[in-house]
């Protein structure tokens, strides 16, 4: 992928909360050095990850970029970070005021018939793409505008975990769905994860 405004925005929006969380853990890391190395790894990881379209064409680019950011911090910590610490870092980042506000702002438009049609159109375009980093999904319309089902058959975060040799961390990234849907006023019923 190219390093675009999406990647810059994600770094500004969620990296500070991640580093604040890690600083509070008192694990003896030099947070300043960790930030610098993480940013370098982040840029490298972005450049070696296949493009899935712009943030406007494919909103899931934000999810993929978030995954890249968190895995880059994990790698910068020389993989000495425990899975529990990684999970806490991801959660703390997602709970940053900017992220919560962004998802709550979508609450009025996320569960409408127009949003369902848009998701279905995006899903059909993604399904045609053979890129393993693309989310392939099937949208099933519900009884009304507020209810729908999305069945994912392929996940960009799973592909990212495999690419970086860190598939064991992908389930912690799946928690993002539950938090974000909750902030938009919905309820997510996950029957399984692809990871």
Please give the residue ranges for each predicted region.
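Residue-level signal for well-ordered alpha-helical segments
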Residues: 11, 46, 50, 54, ...
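Generic structural motif
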Residues: 3, 34, 135-139, 188-191
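Proline- and acidic/polar-enriched loop/turn elements at helix boundaries
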Residues: 36, 88-90, 173, 193
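Amphipathic interaction/junction segments at domain boundaries or subunit interfaces
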Residues: 65-163
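Short, hydrophobic/π-rich interface segment
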Residues: 139-194
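N-terminal, charged low-complexity regulatory/assembly segments
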Residues: 1-74
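Short coil/loop linkers at secondary-structure junctions
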Residues: 28-30, 82-84, 167, 187
């Amino acid at each position: 992928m190219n390093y675009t405004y999406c990647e810059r925005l994600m770094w500004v929006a969620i990296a500070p909360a991640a580093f604040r969380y890690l600083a509070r853990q008192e694990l003896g890391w030099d947070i300043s050095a960790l930030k610098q190395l993480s940013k370098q790894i982040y840029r490298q990881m972005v450049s070696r990850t296949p493009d899935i379209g712009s943030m406007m064409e494919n909103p899931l680019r934000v999810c993929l970029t978030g995954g890249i950011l968190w895995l880059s911090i994990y790698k910068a910590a020389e993989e000495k970070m425990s899975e529990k610490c990684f999970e806490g870092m991801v959660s703390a980042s997602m709970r940053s005021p900017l992220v919560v506000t962004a998802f709550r702002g979508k609450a009025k438009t996320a569960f409408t018939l127009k949003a369902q049609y848009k998701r279905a159109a995006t899903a059909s375009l993604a399904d045609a793409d053979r890129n393993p980093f693309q989310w392939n999904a099937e949208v099933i319309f519900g009884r009304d505008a507020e209810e729908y089902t999305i069945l994912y058959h392929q996940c960009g975060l799973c592909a990212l975990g495999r690419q970086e040799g860190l598939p064991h961390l992908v389930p912690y990234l799946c928690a993002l769905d539950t938090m974000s849907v909750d902030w938009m006023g919905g309820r997510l019923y996950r029957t399984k994860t692809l990871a």
